[in-house]
């Protein structure tokens, strides 16, 4: 049997929607990263972009274990003197819940030229409404093969 070269295929990208209510942040981010990369497809190649679109709803209702709400910190620097910014996960969930999921997924993707392409296909919303109804997204929870760790 010959190996399929994904570069020569006409890749049809699916749209998936997932409700993050009550889901663990790390497990959810792992699943999303794998779908964005296309690891669930039989013709996956690490150097070819074959992934799908993912819509995440209710980003503010994710859960974390242990004391991560108070102990986990997000740090960034503005490149100005005294410009170190530090925020806890609890503050981020109250003010920027979309950013929490976006950062968790981004840090699970490979750090190469494809990372920016993968991240463009991730859509995160705090409420239960989204503006991608025209793409007819599939509910990810119905696909049990991808959802085995939850």
Curated annotation (Swiss-Prot):
SUPFAM superfamilies: Ribosomal protein L13. The keyword Ribonucleoprotein applies. InterPro entries: Ribosomal_uL13, Ribosomal_uL13_bac-type, Ribosomal_uL13_sf. One of its GO terms (molecular function) is structural constituent of ribosome. Coiled coil: none annotated. Keywords: Ribonucleoprotein, Ribosomal protein. GO terms for cellular component: cytosolic large ribosomal subunit. Gene3D superfamilies: Ribosomal protein L13. GO terms for biological process: negative regulation of translation; translation. Disulfide bonds: none annotated. This protein is one of the early assembly proteins of the 50S ribosomal subunit, although it is not seen to bind rRNA by itself. It is important during the early stages of 50S assembly. Belongs to the universal ribosomal protein uL13 family. Part of the 50S ribosomal subunit. This is Large ribosomal subunit protein uL13. The gene is rplM.
């Amino acid at each position: 049997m010959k190996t399929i070269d994904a570069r020569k295929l006409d890749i049809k990208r699916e749209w998936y929607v997932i409700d993050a209510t009550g889901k663990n942040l790390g497990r959810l981010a792992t699943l999303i990263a794998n779908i964005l990369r296309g690891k669930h497809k039989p013709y996956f190649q690490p150097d070819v972009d074959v992934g799908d679109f993912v819509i995440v709803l209710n980003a503010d209702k994710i859960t974390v274990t242990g004391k991560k709400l108070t102990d986990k910190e997000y740090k960034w620097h503005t490149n100005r003197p005294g410009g170190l910014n530090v925020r806890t996960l609890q503050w981020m969930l109250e003010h920027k819940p979309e950013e929490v999921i976006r950062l968790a997924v981004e840090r699970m993707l490979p750090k190469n030229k494809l990372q920016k392409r993968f991240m463009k296909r991730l859509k995160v919303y705090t409420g239960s409404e989204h503006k991608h109804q025209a793409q007819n997204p599939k509910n990810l929870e119905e696909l049990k093969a991808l959802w085995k760790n939850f």
